Every structure is written in structure tokens, then in C-alpha cells.
Curated annotation (Swiss-Prot):
GO MF annotation terms: beta-glucosidase activity
Positions glycosylated per UniProt: 40, 94, 116, 223, 274, 364, 480, 488, 528
Annotated InterPro entries: Cellulose_Degrad_GH3 (IPR051915), Glyco_hydro_3_C (IPR002772), Glyco_hydro_3_C_sf (IPR036881), Glyco_hydro_3_N (IPR001764), Glyco_hydro_3_N_sf (IPR036962), Glycoside_hydrolase_SF (IPR017853)
Gene Ontology CC annotations of this record: extracellular region
Similarity comment: Belongs to the glycosyl hydrolase 3 family.
Biological role stated in the UniProt entry: Beta-glucosidases are one of a number of cellulolytic enzymes involved in the degradation of cellulosic biomass. Catalyzes the last step releasing glucose from the inhibitory cellobiose.
Entry keywords, A to Z: Carbohydrate metabolism, Cellulose degradation, Glycoprotein, Glycosidase, Hydrolase, Polysaccharide degradation, Secreted, Signal
Keyword Secreted part of the UniProt annotation: yes
Active site: 341
Biological processes annotated in GO: cellulose catabolic process
Localization of this protein: Secreted
The protein's name in its UniProt record: Probable beta-glucosidase C
Reaction it catalyzes: Hydrolysis of terminal, non-reducing beta-D-glucosyl residues with release of beta-D-glucose
């Protein structure tokens, strides 16, 4: 089934001109009550699609003031709602109309849930109308963090809402099927384009070599070869073989690999600012980025962290010229856009929590000096900031040349032309409601949820539960009784009353304070002693089947030992769990990382070295199947 992106036609093509340039030929969708200006003798070159893209960029750049150029270098959040809304208190912000009309900004990250595709498309169309009313009419590029799975944490991702719902990236890695990854990316692209989103702030290709890190669920696991293989399909699914009007551009992150954070703490926070390489293994973490560049990655984002104990200066990667210019651009040959992670210049708030600027290693620099340092490092655009006046000041004071600004602005404008935004930035809002979350897309997501389940243990082949009576009684935790009752089984109040127990648990973590920080699952990977004792009573009372949501590699040897069967899942609903338990679907997943045997083993392993944990309970690649329960290298089956 092929669903065309609203506002664009399948026959849209790139026409080669005699000059060797490429000109864009499209038949635009235009919202009712609005018209795109027609070409005439006075049409500027940059608005004339018969010219090649490089000529159009040159023409536009020559017309821009330094203030208009400065606005292009900023990419910040966009909140759904009135365009003149400025928020209040800790959520105060410049209004959208101010950022577009006064600050000349044209890159925004949609930072709110999408609950109605048509309304979101209409909202983005209104933003494009506002942008076209400015002096030069530069269209807006709207981006998003991942929003096709189960994670809800402003700053890292959103639940699917009206979009089709799939496993997290770590679940696609468990499935190990390049075709499914490509299909996911193509579906997500169609749904993004339908509402007007043209930039994906993903994939996250960090290697999960530090199992305590809070951001593993959006990675592809611990293995660089598997990560590299799958990310190629991911990028090509979003962008196509070449970036164009049918593409959603991707932002590959977090260079040079965000996984080896010291003690597993995340560098959003000052206590997690260090990235360490005790195994001298930086090269391993670069492999996915090399694959991404070869696959056509057009934009790369460095992480917040600062390297310690290496040949590099211990300053955050976006401030680090040897990382951005010498390593990424010169050594790896990347000539695309480098977008910083969010909030490196200005202190601010995320989810109501105060967050100092993540200027690790250069905290003592002024905001102006930080901006200059980032540009000098080789970055093009400031994420999560809305401070064009700093760029204007840098140029006016002779600290940064306007020619240097032009280098980055040229990259950013060219991307807009390649995406076709200058020729038609609008989408068909009514069609968006038909494309987003359509039955076919939803079915594909549900199939992937079920297939990605990983069967870790299956004592006495207890699963699938196929030959049980309708009078069977279940004790459950972690999901609503209505899911079981829809199968016409009975839910009871205690394990002692039940014939089976079905438990769904999140992987263990230590709760943290704060609005944003509280959503980051960090700290210990093991349940505390009180919780272990509570669970043990269930396992001793009734045959128990456990599903652990593996957003991180859980330390659960006691559950493997005591429960009858244990699954790992990576983003799935309760219907998917029950379909796998009752044999409607079969688990096909393989572990995308090692499962450590203890926290002592976790603490002893080197942060930058994959598969460095001592005596893992299960190794990378473990996964049983219903057809052949011992189809793995696990000693449990020997």
C-alpha cells in the first residue's frame, strides 16, 4: 500500500538543467484562501523554481541582512497553540510570531503531543503563512523528536498519540530485520510529512556500552555492526536514496557517540557531564557515524558531554573544534549541517525544572563567548536557543566574520530548497487525518511490537499458554484487568487464588527529583531488596510469567531463577503481551545487549567497551522461540 505525502505528488521530479544544477518541479497543494505567488518577470531568482538550487541560494543569501542570516542559525521549540502565546512563569518563551517576525527564525522543534493530525497540519500551515508574510518569505522547517513509540519525556521523545505505534529503536534492534526498519522509517516519514514535519531529530546511534545510561531505549543496542546495518535502512527510509521533496531529513546523533558516560549518568545534568574512555575505545563508537555519513546523513548532532582522559580538550563536544572540525568534518568527511544539542548558551527550564546551560568545561564563558566558541568549533546551528542578537553582536564587533556566518546559512537554506519548502511549504490538512494512524500503518506497528518480544526463559515450556480452560484464574500486575477479561478469563486479587500470574514491570531504576530529571530512568538496574522479597512471594505461590520492559539492561537474575517464563519487551501495549503469552503471536526478538548478572559487574565494566560485563545472565543475541525453545547459545538450554 502506498500513501502519498499530502501536498506532494509521486510524479514530482528533479529536472537537470544544462548548467548541471537541479531545479525542482512540483505541483503544489495550497490551502483554501491562500495563494502562492506566480512567477513573472519581476520574480526574484530564489523564488523561481526554474533556476538551479545553488543559484537560488546565492540570490537569497545576497539579499539577506545580518539579522535575517542570524535567525537561520537557531532551532528551538515550537508549542502548539496561539501564535502570539508567550507562556508564563517557568514556561515563558518568545511567541512564535515574535520568533518568526522579529527574530527571523525559521527552524522549530514541535515540542507538544499530537492528538489530532488535521489540527496539527492546520497549525503548521498557519506558521508557514506567517513565515511567507515576512520580507523574504523564507519557509519554516518543522522538526520533532521521536513520536512513534511509548516514551513520553519532553526533550527526548513523545508517545505515539495519533501516529502508528511501534517498539522503541531498541526493539527494532531486537527484531534484527532491516526490512522492518526500512518500513518503519517509510511509514513514519509519511505520517510526519502529512502534518508538515520535515525534519526528524533522530536516529540516535549511540552504542549502549554503559548499561545504566538513561537513553538506551532510543539506541540500537550494544553492537556497532548491527547498529550500522539498521541505521542505513532507517536513514534511507526517511530520506530516500537522495534528499528531496518526498523526504524527511534525519539528524543523526549524538556525535561522537553518547554511550560511554561516566557512571552511566546523563550529560543533560552537571553530575553527568563527563564522557570517559577507560578502554581507549572511541573508534568503536565512531563506526555508526561512518555508516550514517556513507548512507547520506545530511545533519549530525554532537552530544552534551565533555571527553575526559583523552587526547581531546575536556570541553563539551559542540564547543570542541578538534571533535567537530578535525574529526567529524576533516577526518570523516562530513560536509552537512552540524546542529548542537539543546541549550548550550542560555540557562532555562525543561518541564518546569531549572536547567543551567550545558556548557560543560566552558561554564565560565559569557553567553556571547559561548556562541563564538560553538561557531569556531564548526557547528552551524544552535539547538534550543533563540538568541540571534548574539550573532549580530559577534559580527558587528568583528569577533566572527559575516563570511563565516554565510557558510552555515548557505547549508541551512540549501536544505530548505532541496526539501521543496520554498516551492510549497503547505500540506493538505484534511488528507493528514486520513494518512496519520491509518489502519495499515497501525497494523504494521502492532506486528512489530509482537515480533520484537524476546523470550529469555521458558521453564517447562510454559508459554505459549494455549491449552487452558476459560475458567482459568489469573493474578496480574502492571496492566488493567480488562485486557485479560476480554479473553474471558478471570482476574483474582491474590496470587494464592490464581492458577497463573502475569506481571509487567518496567526495568528497575532509581527515581530522581525534578520535572525533566524525574522522567529519566537512571541509577541502579536492580530491584531493591524489599521489592525482590515481595515478588518472590508471587513466584513461590503460582506459576508466573513476567514481562520486563527493557529500556535499559535489567539486572534480574532472581526473576530468571524464580519465574516460570520471562520476556523482554521494548515498547508494546498489553494486548501485544497477551497475544504473545497466549500464542496468537510468537516472540522473534534477540537481546540487543548483554544482561548483567549483578550491579557489581555493572560497576566494574568499562564504559566505552561493549560486552565487558562479567558473566552476564544472558548474552547479546540470546532469545528463545516457541518452535525451538533451545535455539540460543544460553547455558540454560545446554
Amino acid at each position: 500500500m502506498k500513501v502519498l505525502a499530502p501536498g506532494y505528488l509521486a510524479e514530482a521530479s528533479l529536472t537537470a538543467l544544462a548548467s548541471g544544477c537541479q531545479a525542482l518541479s512540483t505541483r503544489p497543494y495550497v490551502p483554501r484562501g491562500y495563494s502562492l505567488s506566480r512567477r513573472n518577470d519581476s520574480t526574484p531568482i530564489y523564488k523561481d523554481a526554474s533556476y538551479c538550487i545553488d543559484e537560488r541560494v546565492d540570490d537569497l543569501l545576497a539579499r539577506m541582512t545580518i539579522e535575517e542570516k542570524a535567525g537561520q542559525l537557531f532551532h528551538t521549540r515550537l508549542m502548539d497553540g496561539p501564535l502570539d502565546d508567550e507562556g508564563s512563569g517557568n514556561n515563558a518563551h518568545n511567541s512564535t510570531s515574535n520568533m518568526i517576525g522579529e527574530k527571523h527564525m525559521t527552524h522549530f522543534n514541535l515540542a507538544s503531543d499530537i492528538t489530532n493530525a488535521t489540527e496539527t497540519a492546520e497549525f503548521i500551515n498557519r506558521i508557514q503563512e506567517l513565515a511567507l508574510q515576512t520580507r523574504l518569505g523564507i519557509p519554516v522547517t518543522v522538526s520533532t523528536d521521536p513520536r512513534h513509540s511509548f516514551t513520553e519525556n519532553v526533550g527526548t521523545g513523545f508517545k505515539a498519540g495519533v501516529f502508528s505505534q511501534w517498539p522503541e529503536s531498541i526493539g527494532l534492534a531486537a527484531l534484527r530485520d532491516p526490512y522492518v526498519v526500512r518500513k518503519f522509517a517509510e511509514v513514519a516519514k509519511e505520517e510526519y510529512i502529512a502534518v508538515g514535519i520535515r525534519a526528524a531529530l533522530h536516529p540516535q546511534v549511540d552504542l549502549s556500552t554503559e548499561p545504566r545510561w538513561a537513553r538506551i531505549s532510543n539506541t540500537w543496542g550494544e553492537n556497532s555492526t548491527l547498529t550500522s546495518e539498521l541505521l542505513v535502512e532507517y536513514i534511507k527510509g526517511f530520506q530516500g536514496d537522495k534528499l528531496g521533496p518526498q523526504s524527511v531529513k534525519t539528524v543523526t546523533k549524538h556525535f561522537p557517540g553518547g554511550g560511554p558516560v561516566e557512571n552511566g549518568e546523563d550529560s543533560h545534568f552537571a553530575y553527568g557531564k563527563n564522557q570517559t574512555y577507560p578502554g581507549n575505545n572511541l573508534e568503536e563508537h565512531l563506526k555508526p557515524f561512518k555508516a550514517a555519513i556513507a548512507a547520506g546523513a545530511t545533519e549530525i548532532m554532537p552530544y552534551y558531554s565533555r571527553p575526559i582522559g583523552t587526547e581531546y580538550e575536556p570541553v563539551a563536544f559542540s564547543f570542541n573544534k578538534r571533535i567537530v572540525t578535525e574529526l567529524l568534518r576533516n577526518e570523516l568527511g562530513f560536509d552537512g549541517i552540524v546542529l548542537t544539542d539543546w541549550g548550550l548558551i542560555t540557562d532555562g527550564y525543561i518541564a518546569g525544572q531549572y536547567m543551567p546551560a550545558r556548557a560543560w568545561g566552558v561554564e565560565n564563558l559569557t553567553e556571547l563567548q559561548r556562541a563564538a566558541r560553538i561557531l569556531d568549533a564548526g557547528c552551524d546551528q544552535f539547538g534550543g536557543e533563540e538568541r540571534p542578537e548574539l550573532i549580530v553582536q559577534l559580527v558587528q564587533e568583528g569577533i566572527i566574520s559575516e563570511d563565516r556566518i554565510d557558510v552555515s546559512v548557505r547549508r541551512l537554506l540549501k536544505e530548505k530548497f532541496v526539501l521543496g519548502l520554498f516551492d510549497n511549504p503547505f500540506v493538505d490538512a484534511e488528507a493528514a487525518g486520513r494518512v496519520v494512524g491509518n489502519d495499515y500503518f497501525v497494523r504494521l506497528g502492532r506486528e512489530a511490537q509482537r515480533r520484537s518480544y524476546t523470550l529469555l526463559s521458558n521453564n517447562e515450556d510454559i508459554v505459549p499458554l494455549k491449552k487452558i480452560e476459560k475458567s482459568t484464574k489469573f493474578y496480574i500486575e502492571g496492566f488493567n484487568a480488562s485486557f485479560i477479561e476480554s479473553w474471558n478469563y478471570t482476574v483474582v486479587d491474590s496470587p494464592e487464588e490464581a492458577e497463573y500470574a502475569l506481571l509487567r514491570y518496567n526495568a528497575p531504576y532509581e527515581p530522581r527529583p525534578g520535572g525533566f530529571e524525574a522522567n529519566m530512568h537512571a541509577g541502579s538496574l536492580a530491584f531493591n531488596d524489599t521489592e525482590k522479597a515481595r515478588q518472590a512471594k508471587i513466584y513461590s505461590a503460582v506459576p508466573t510469567i513476567v514481562d520486563i520492559v527493557m529500556d535499559r539492561p535489567a539486572v534480574i537474575p532472581e526473576i530468571i531463577e524464580q519465574a516460570k517464563a520471562v520476556f523482554a519487551s521494548y515498547g508494546s501495549d498489553s494486548n501485544a503481551f497477551l497475544d504473545v503469552v497466549f500464542g496468537v503471536s510468537a516472540p522473534e526478538g534477540k537481546l540487543p545487549f548483554d544482561l548483567p548478572s549483578s550491579m557489581e559487574a555493572v560497576e566494574a565494566q568499562m564504559e566505552d567497551v561493549p560486552f565487558d560485563t562479567r558473566n552476564p545472565v544472558f548474552k547479546f543475541g540470546h532469545g528463545l522461540s516457541y518452535a525451538n525453545p533451545c535455539a540460543s547459545s544460553s547455558s540454560k538450554c545446554s
